[in-house]
Amino acid sequence: MEINNQNQCVPYNCLSNPKEIILGEERLETGNTVADISLGLINFLYSNFVPGGGFIVGLLELIWGFIGPSQWDIFLAQIEQLISQRIEEFARNQAISRLEGLSNLYKVYVRAFSDWEKDPTNPALREEMRIQFNDMNSALITAIPLFRVQNYEVALLSVYVQAANLHLSILRDVSVFGERWGYDTATINNRYSDLTSLIHVYTNHCVDTYNQGLRRLEGRFLSDWIVYNRFRRQLTISVLDIVAFFPNYDIRTYPIQTATQLTREVYLDLPFINENLSPAASYPTFSAAESAIIRSPHLVDFLNSFTIYTDSLARYAYWGGHLVNSFRTGTTTNLIRSPLYGREGNTERPVTITASPSVPIFRTLSYITGLDNSNPVAGIEGVEFQNTISRSIYRKSGPIDSFSELPPQDASVSPAIGYSHRLCHATFLERISGPRIAGTVFSWTHRSASPTNEVSPSRITQIPWVKAHTLASGASVIKGPGFTGGDILTRNSMGELGTLRVTFTGRLPQSYYIRFRYASVANRSGTFRYSQPPSYGISFPKTMDAGEPLTSRSFAHTTLFTPITFSRAQEEFDLYIQSGVYIDRIEFIPVTATFEAEYDLERAQKVVNALFTSTNQLGLKTDVTDYHIDQVSNLVACLSDEFCLDEKRELSEKVKHAKRLSDERNLLQDPNFRGINRQPDRGWRGSTDITIQGGDDVFKENYVTLPGTFDECYPTYLYQKIDESKLKAYTRYQLRGYIEDSQDLEIYLIRYNAKHEIVNVPGTGSLWPLSVENQIGPCGEPNRCAPHLEWNPDLHCSCRDGEKCAHHSHHFSLDIDVGCTDLNEDLGVWVIFKIKTQDGHARLGNLEFLEEKPLLGEALARVKRAEKKWRDKRETLQLETTIVYKEAKESVDALFVNSQYDRLQADTNIAMIHAADKRVHRIREAYLPELSVIPGVNAAIFEELEERIFTAFSLYDARNIIKNGDFNNGLLCWNVKGHVEVEEQNNHRSVLVIPEWEAEVSQEVRVCPGRGYILRVTAYKEGYGEGCVTIHEIENNTDELKFNNCVEEEVYPNNTVTCINYTATQEEYEGTYTSRNRGYDEAYGNNPSVPADYASVYEEKSYTDRRRENPCESNRGYGDYTPLPAGYVTKELEYFPETDKVWIEIGETEGTFIVDSVELLLMEE
């Protein structure tokens, strides 16, 4: 048979002899040797992946001592046939010769290893082993590049992966046995570095080349898809499945036997034989076949049953459609029912084929319709399904054997024991018109993907998270990158991933380290949960940039800080992650004393080295926080003195160096909280209720506790200014730290504007489980080496309505950009922490303010624009302040008789003082709106005038002989008869209320006989009758002021009486007045209702000045003055006592009498 078009598919079952493959003019007898060898190798890697003689000899017997030139030629021919590209004779012969040479060299290597293993202290054998390793390593370094010759990378891929696998295995050998062979530590470490680097190099080449070949086979027609799918299946087995084991060669990450699972699916050929009965364009297209046959990424499932429907055409009956029932890993009760594939034909009764976790279907024998090439249907007439104990037949058995493509992995035992794949699903491609297609395509999973996630007590167990039984809302399964052995999971927003059920097979309780293989586009955090509380926080450091493709180097490992002890045979796990994190698998590492010590040391070495930007430890990585350094210090301190004392000392010195570098780059003064308010102009300033506490199970160093407050006008606060001299021009800075727990904690960074976040971080109590003993050390210190829980690093949003919901991580950070610096202006950056609610609280420490990066591009332009806007507003403010200050000073000066401000003018009254004070408070930017204890640009002139206002009030109070005449102290100093009340009105004013005519309030006052006094009363009368304030002596000499609710002017013949409309006297007092310092809003028209939730520095609105007016900013001396409503009047009379005592009496005839103040003032001489 000739092939006229090399791009045309020639399926093996189109031929008169389906067991032959035609390649050009050659015939290759196939027992699918490549698949046999590859699956045998996979089985070996799965079950015997332990360094030593057994592995070395096994690799020789399976591959390098078994395969000869003819078998290597079959490896090359398989791909040549698929991609219709023949390797040039020279390149082909060179590749086979190189492979043969490597085989011969490896036989010598194995023989030398066997001799050394019998006498490991023999110097000659040790030297021989070094010679053989060096020769083997050099040969592989030379040979492997020849297996990726340009233009033949795809054709050579299956032999490339075998050579790469061999190279990684001998590099692991020297990493394990090198010291006993006589290599020094530096050489061993260098070869281990080669190993870890080449794992990525070889993996990426295999995956990239596989994808290149696959893309090359994409086409338009169904025949193109058949070749495409065959390439995908065959190279998944011969290349990608082997690559999935490459990370296990990292002996320091996987020091013991490791159980790996392959969760990918492979699809057998479409039963399609009559392609010549109709033009190719009339068949389903390439894309239609791919969409119909290949399932989208999904959680791993296992077959429970098929329900098969039979259809017919002419005299032929065939598989016309089916339903699939399946179950997820670890659960057999919740069946998943597929949609109907094909049609629900009724030519014959439906047939049900069953399977189970313990009895899987491992083989099919299909009878393809029209083997005589006359059947008008391309499909299946019958299938025999073989499981591990019996067989089931749909209509009839046939010669098309699934073992031809998916042979057993172990031919030395019966197929029911040595099978490699289990049937998991079947899809369908249908065409009804013309020559009919009823193409059932079986999909298979590797047997390593077990129906239950069993965790071994003696192996490292890798469980892909795609084996979860439930996928959380918002989580998704995405196509794997090719080297993970299956698909992976991710989320597009913060939330749960999906529930994974595992079974512990060993004696319980058993302890394991929990590790995750992941990729992340940024530094992320997550939470690991299982059915026994509590949850465990875990970090996912950045491994790649957003938008980059997933490569081998994109994936890393992250481990829970301490092992977890499990006491139940079955547990369910879930992982709470942020967006941009990709999860491959969870790994369970059994804990033993020696292994734990070695594992702890290796982990400590990795995390210590990861602190620095380079191996010479000259600088810290920017994303290494001060809190993280403290935790690394704890990790090093907990290393075993018995196993690794010298290494512990070395690591401890490195961590101390890292801590010193962290202190040097931190621009905050006293970051360790040695004291608050210790120095007036340096360090931390704060409210008196803040406490400093020593290290505990969360913090290694001091931390601060901020309690709540009962009055939001008096918040709990902590602040510090970063001096201008420490800042660089056009640079971004970052404030960051660690919060143990908080509620309503407000964080501010202020320069040109305020960056603001409200952070709520629920704590989890003690970090130690209740079952842990010795939580406290012998001297009362926290035992940081005791097994402890991890903090929950990211939590659901818990902000109340109307508040900005910032991040809720224990780790917080806030950026601010600095433009031009000016030492004379000394603008600096204010760092503020504030709580203004009763339920608020916070515990925080490890605070840092450090340089992040210079500003470039758009960020630079934005900060320049913000700086210009700020300076324009500052200039406007200065002009305004000049005018306002002049008016305010004139009002204040008018209250006094001289510039010494020690005497008031005779006619100065309370309304004049309040009016002057209001003018003073028109001076804006006296204090920061965010925290009114921090002085602003106009603080000096404001406090100058405010001090004189205080003096005026003091002098005025001294002139009033009546004690508690404003009733601010209730009824203190007053004699009371009957029922009266003192009520607070209009926020801050206390007034005397006399509601009954029989009630009376009086006070005895000492005076100077013969001197003149002014009695001044401000009051309001409700209802009928009169309110009276009387002044008298023991005998006669009585005067009174009367108040009523009528409009007639009252005449007092014996005295000079003035009736004043009090509200008019207060001049500009319109509505409620709050004595506070305004921000920019009033002058520039900004909306004061906009909350102070400033956006990211990357958004333009971040630089818009939107500071709110703070109603709690006081005049720093007395309570807010609120003018009285209309209706209150002030009346005066002159009184000349004849004795040294007078009585002031207040009463009424009916209705209600409300008195604001009573004053008795000595006249000037």
Curated annotation (Swiss-Prot):
Keyword Isomerase: no
GO biological processes: sporulation resulting in formation of a cellular spore; symbiont-mediated killing of host cell
Keywords, comma-separated and alphabetical: Sporulation, Toxin, Virulence
InterPro entries hit by this protein: Cry1Ac-like_dom-VII, Cry_V, Galactose-bd-like_sf, Pest_crys, Pest_crys_dom-III, Pest_crys_dom_I, Pest_crys_N_sf, Pest_cryst_cen_dom_sf
Gene Ontology terms, MF aspect: signaling receptor binding; toxin activity
UniProt keyword annotation of tRNA-binding present: no
Gene3D superfamilies: Galactose-binding domain-like, Pesticidal crystal protein, central domain, Pesticidal crystal protein, N-terminal domain
SUPFAM superfamilies: delta-Endotoxin (insectocide), middle domain, delta-Endotoxin (insectocide), N-terminal domain, Galactose-binding domain-like
Further remarks about this protein from its record: Toxic segment of the protein is located in the N-terminus.
Stated family: Belongs to the delta endotoxin family.
Function: Promotes colloidosmotic lysis by binding to the midgut epithelial cells of many lepidopteran larvae.
Protein name: Pesticidal crystal protein Cry1Da
Species: Bacillus thuringiensis subsp. aizawai
Gene: cry1Da
